[in-house]
């Protein structure tokens, strides 16, 4: 029969291993400039404007060359972000409702920012870029901030 004194160190070791495992599983930081580019998903602006308002913001014809379409460029940026940081990249891209200047998205003639924000929230989903996120699925929670 095990004594109390031999169980306590074993329990302590188990707890410490669990805490260490949880700490290492939290992944990288996801801040603009630290874990994310300074302007996350800047390349998605064209795709979002095209899909929400049918306009081009680049001032030139939109490429239809495979691998170089606005969607392709946007999805590549999302794919290049670490899985752990993709939702945070979308959060930075759409900005906060309380601070309109925090968004990469801009009000454009005939294309207000709100429809762009609504569309950008689904960029990670299977109907668009289909990239896995921190949730191990192609979706992000809590983007209505």
From Swiss-Prot:
Residues 1-25 form the signal peptide. One of its GO terms (cellular component) is extracellular region. It is found in: Secreted. Its main location: secreted. The keyword Magnesium does not apply. CM proteins would be involved in the cooking quality of pasta. This is Alpha-amylase/trypsin inhibitor CM1. It comes from Triticum aestivum.
